[in-house]
UniProtKB/Swiss-Prot annotation:
This is High mobility group protein B4. Belongs to the HMGB family. CDD domains: HMG-box_HMGB_rpt1 (cd21978), HMG-box_HMGB_rpt2 (cd21979). It comes from Mus musculus (Mouse). Residues 9-79, 93-161 bind DNA. The gene is Hmgb4.
Length: 181
């Protein structure tokens, strides 16, 4: 993960957290020598939160709204580090689809044709229901095809890794010989 960004604005706090911080400070003032464990303190705090009036809760909710507005304002002005996405090697073999995805590909057009106003999500849910109600005999061709594709993928992956190791080895050898000269 690395270091946290020190300039990033602090996240907004809920009304309950504002209440809890206030309750803790009051409790320490009233009973400075008393120690409460986290579990016991949380229990007392939640009991108190449930017992206070809506009027009192409104004060904490207003504080939470102000804090939320502050956070949103600071985030609009904040320009953080952009995380670089690791680029995928275009020569690397792609993972094969599962038996369900193969089934979905075959039935997508039919479902979309029957229900043209459905979104992709709705079609996918319907395909999932169809898959779960399909018997094993109908699933078998998809599972066999997926197994073949998976075996082919593992072979390609092994060849790709060996090829990458070969490139690294050649690079190291050429670097060593250039250093000797």
């Amino acid at each position: 993960m690395g270091e946290k960004d020190q300039l990033r604005p602090k996240v907004n706090v809920s009304s309950y957290i504002h209440f809890m911080l206030n309750f803790r400070n009051k409790f320490k003032e009233q009973q400075p020598n008393t120690y409460l464990g986290f579990k016991e303190f949380s229990r007392k705090c939640s009991e108190k939160w449930r017992s206070i009036s809506k009027h009192e809760k409104a004060k904490y909710e207003a504080l939470a709204e102000l804090d939320k507005a502050r956070y949103q304002q600071e985030m609009m002005n904040y320009i953080g580090k952009r995380r670089k996405r690791r680029k995928r090697d275009p020569k690397a073999p792609r993972k094969p689809p599962s038996s369900f995805l193969l089934f979905s590909r075959d039935h997508y057009a039919m479902l979309k044709q029957e229900n043209p106003d459905w979104t992709v999500v709705q079609v996918a849910k319907a395909a999932g229901k169809m898959w779960s109600t399909t018997d094993e005999a109908e699933k078998k061709p998809y599972e066999q095809k997926a197994a073949l594709m998976r075996a082919k993928y593992f072979e390609e992956q092994e060849a790709y890794r060996n090829q990458c190791q070969g490139r690294k080895g050649n690079f190291l050898e050429s670097a060593k010989t250039s250093l000797k000269q």
